[in-house]
Amino acid sequence: MEGDLSGFNIDAPRWDQCTFLGRVKHFFNITDPRTVFASEQELDWAKAVVEKSRMGLVPPGTQMEQLLYAKKLYDSAFHPDTGEKMNVIGRMSFQVPGGMLITGFMLQFYRTMPAVIFWQWVNQSFNALVNYTNRNAASPTSVRQMALSYFTATTTAVATAVGMNMWTKRAPPLVGRWVPFAAVAAANCVNIPMMRQQELIQGICVKDRNQNELGHSQRAAAVGIAQVVISRITMAAPGMILLPVIMERLERLHLMKKVKVMHAPLQVLLCGCFLLFMVPVACGLFPQECELSVSYLEPELRDTIKAKYGEQVLFVYFNKGL
């Protein structure tokens, strides 16, 4: 489809972000694992196209499909706050290939203590990078904070896994298979708030509908971080809860007993199937651009906004991160 696209608003969402289904479609688009394989030249091209489109300088003959593809690549690889290119492993589009490998091996190698400790460490290293990459970039994070967050989350995950492994020794085998999920959930409750503690201490930047900065709110930061924690646990839950049940049944089959070497690859593949759908679903649970009533903000910030804008500003907006 060709035509004059100079007035096309490339930043306008293709799907309604006020609805869950619209957000899921949006994240299906930008978390597409295939975008991980886009070359640096393609990503630079996408950024150039998006920036030119924002200025109304779309080259004549450009097709709508090209603009939409450029925006897809841009959203998958560049940070929404800074516009900087994100590292490949930390992108949400890498959640499927990266997550399926780590989750599959966590679920497969859960019996021995060294394996539990190693794979929980690998998982928390991956999570720490993802959390940092997808943070709200308006709130800087120091190296000390990142190191403390990483150490605390890894310790929490390993302690939970080791403790529950010891506790479930006499429990049915299926219960032991759920230990990795308990460790992941516990670590997410620590890792994300710790990685973004600066937002909880100093507040997150909140804006009005026209993107004018209004101040910093700790309450808004707490809401955004809580939503991210819920999303991350939701992302992992179906695969890490249902897959052990599936594998428990499959491993009883005569064929599976003969090809034990295929158990790990099968778990990795099935994890990928779960994550392919759960990454966009979990990311779409809450709007990325959060809306919060002014009445919920801290009294000082609320009074400042009302004194300056009166009743014109009833809601504030902020990027909660992913």
From Swiss-Prot:
Subcellular location: Mitochondrion inner membrane; Mitochondrion outer membrane
Membrane spanning residue stretches: 99-119, 147-167, 174-194, 223-243, 266-286
Main location: mitochondrion
Pfam families: SFXNs
Acetylation keyword on record: yes
Reaction(s) this enzyme catalyzes, per UniProt: L-serine(in) = L-serine(out)
Keywords: Acetylation, Amino-acid transport, Membrane, Mitochondrion, Mitochondrion inner membrane, Mitochondrion outer membrane, Transmembrane, Transmembrane helix, Transport
Name the record gives this protein: Sideroflexin-2
Species per Swiss-Prot/TrEMBL record: Mus musculus (Mouse)
Encoding gene, per UniProt annotation: Sfxn2
